[in-house]
Amino acid sequence: MPDQLTVYNPATGEEIKTIPQQSATEVEEAIERSHQAFKTWSKTSANERTSLLKKWYELIVEHKEELADLITKENGKPYQEAVGEVLYGAGYIEWFAEEAKRVYGRTVPAPTTGKRIVVTRQPVGPVAAITPWNFPNAMITRKAAPALAAGCTFIIKPAPDTPLSAYELARLAYEAGIPKDVLQVVIGDGEEIGNVFTSSPKIRKITFTGSTPVGKILMKNSADTVKHVSMELGGHAPLIVDEDADIDLAVEQAMASKYRNAGQTCVCANRLIVHESIKDEFAAKLSEQVSKLKVGNGLEEGVNVGPIINKRGFEKIVSQIDDAVEKGAKVIAGGTYDRNDDKGCYFVNPTVLTDVDTSMNIMHEETFGPVAPIVTFSDIDEAIQLANDTPYGLAAYFFTENYRRGIYISENLEYGIIGWNDGGPSAVQAPFGGMKESGIGREGGSEGIEPYLETKYLSIGL
């Protein structure tokens, strides 16, 4: 492994910064520091942790422009989206700063008069987090905030494509007064660091956002030391548009869900399942809006869609489009690319496909790109079956004006997050997480602090 990691702008190929990488030994040293710091951090009062987290939140909001500029440079997403990410991520710190004071125990009626039973909650211990490149700021704060609020220490291993946001967040945390050994950042070989995290008995919890195959490896490797795990894994989100839907609303929300961050999110609508009676109108209106999107460098004025993060992601998107077209799909918008292998820059013009069927790879594989395949249905149970025909169960969307139909759809979709006439359901106040192979645990809401807490009960003999 090289001693240095160079970070590049995916929109221009320009070098942003070169940073040192950590060896396995250095990661083990970071774990030891985290272990020692836990002894004092876990004993701090909830009010003190609340105060420090609020200061961190305020500093992030104060520096939102610089943080957003950094996100756009290392990730490529449009600047305004990056500002939104910073504020969204900061919201988790603000939320869990308050939740730190709401970690309650309870007393339990004892089976005999000679006993008292008291239940308490305690931090689980040092936590290791592995975070993705698509939200290099918010996926850190969404994990760090509840961990620190609960009294855990925290080590972040960010994605090698986008590590700079992690270091800047840590710098602001230290400025807020959070001790350096309580919140640490390490970067290096992903497999090597993952193995150090999972094998160390001093790490008591692993939290990961990323692909399902990698999540499974982390879970297996964590079993030997019986770690707590939180996994926010892959998605393959359906978006159902029923025959009575408000088509203009469905198009507007599909645009927001599908093309945000160039389609590179785990909750992006990946399959548009549209009633056959309105397919033509929906497809025409969607294509009209897609054609208005501007592709380019996220720092340029008016850009809506930035680059694909790397060559591997680009080639997967192209292969899905090619496979669909070979099997009979029609490209009614986009379908063109701009690639520069010398600079490592890859752009996909937002694409809409019709005449899609289940023989095509795009119906079974997460795309992670700005491609909207439209498949039709005639009966709502057929739509639900299509939606559930996947091992994933993170997010789903549907559009109907019939409340009975809406309740029926929501109760039969096998997904942890569902948007009804809403293409952007994620919120700090709500529990984010998936079913089936899309993960374990929830982030956000009152549930978000639970994975970082142990339950202990004390039986007192009188």
Swiss-Prot record:
A GO term for molecular function: succinate-semialdehyde dehydrogenase (NADP+) activity
Induction profile: Transcriptionally regulated by GabR in the presence of GABA. Up-regulated under low pH conditions and ethanol. Expression from the gabD promoter was induced by growth in the presence of glutamate.
Phenotype of gene-disrupted mutants: Cells lacking this gene are unable to use GABA as sole nitrogen source. No effect on vanillin degradation.
InterPro entries, per the entry: Ald_DH/histidinol_DH (IPR016161), Ald_DH_C (IPR016163), Ald_DH_CS_CYS (IPR016160), Ald_DH_N (IPR016162), Aldehyde_DH_dom (IPR015590), Aldehyde_DH_NAD(P) (IPR012394), Aldehyde_DH_Superfamily (IPR050740), Succ_semiAld_DH (IPR010102)
Residues annotated for NADP(+) binding in this entry: W133, N134, K157, P158, A159, P160, G210, S211, L233, E366
Keyword Transmembrane helix belongs to the record: no
Gene Ontology terms describing biological process: aldehyde metabolic process; gamma-aminobutyric acid catabolic process
Catalytic activity: succinate semialdehyde + NADP(+) + H2O = succinate + NADPH + 2 H(+)
Chain's role: Catalyzes the NADP(+) dependent oxidation of succinate semialdehyde to succinate.
Family to which this protein belongs: Belongs to the aldehyde dehydrogenase family.
Additional record remark: Expressed from the major gabT promoter and from an additional gabD promoter.
Protein name as it appears in the record: Succinate-semialdehyde dehydrogenase [NADP(+)]
Organism of provenance: Bacillus subtilis (strain 168)
High-level lineage: Bacteria, Bacillati, Bacillota, Bacilli, Bacillales
